[in-house]
Amino acid sequence: MLRLLSFLFLVSAFFSCLPEKTALERALREAGDNRMELEKVLAYYRDDTLKYQAACFLIENMPDQYAVLPLDSTDTYARALLSLDKEDPVSWEISRSLVAAVFDSISKIQPESRIKIVRDIEVMTSDYLIENIESAFKVWNRRGVAKHYSFDDFCSYVLPYRVAHEPLSHWRRTALQRYGHWLDSLNAPQEVARSIAMRYPVRYNAGMTKYPYIMSYEEMDSLQWGTCDDMTAFLTLSLRAIGIPAATDVV
């Protein structure tokens, strides 16, 4: 009996000394059928140390990332969003906002929003992730921008492909088209950030608080209305797209 207990103790001690699975391994396991897409990214960057580390950073954090989307394309709220008028003279007062009136009328037809949760780890494509990494590194390496902040800051505040639970989109392309001309001024990043904050197009509309989903960057750019959260997300992504570290916070 004593010999058996000694054996069990040794086995237990052996397994307790084994290293835990890495965050990367856990993420790849959670990807399930989508694992191959993520492994394509790792293989693509196997000879580039920094970009490989960046890919690992995104994949390791991916299990907690997801989008909140309308259940299907027939969702009345989502369809109405595309046809909202950009002119709303009393946007600050929800009781007089034309946007609020539109969503109030929809709530009588569709009382509850119908959502679905889509996990990034299960749908992320290698093409999307590689494009995001390449675009982020391109602006980071431009004209000595990298000297202003560390690689760790780059991974945390420039590299991420989302800020909340918005739909995945090619927001870097859109933002670069709008703000790419600021790239030549990045030796003064604080001035650039201040200028963009003063000029960016998304305006507050209290009526948008009645919209039950989160807009994509392109939707915000097109509609030019949003909540405080929308405006914050739009500015954060705009700054990241040109290589200025940015994040959102609750005040």
Q: Which positions does each model-derived feature cover?
A:
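Generic structural signal for short, flexible, solvent-exposed coil/loop and linker residues
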Residues: 3-6, 118, 160, 217, ...
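Bacterial Sec-dependent N-terminal signal peptides
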Residues: 1-23
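Generic hydrophobic-segment detector
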Residues: 6-7, 24, 198, 216
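N-terminal accessory/pre-domain segments preceding catalytic cores
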Residues: 17-197, 220, 241-242
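Active-site neighborhood of thiol-dependent amide/isopeptide-bond enzymes
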Residues: 182-251
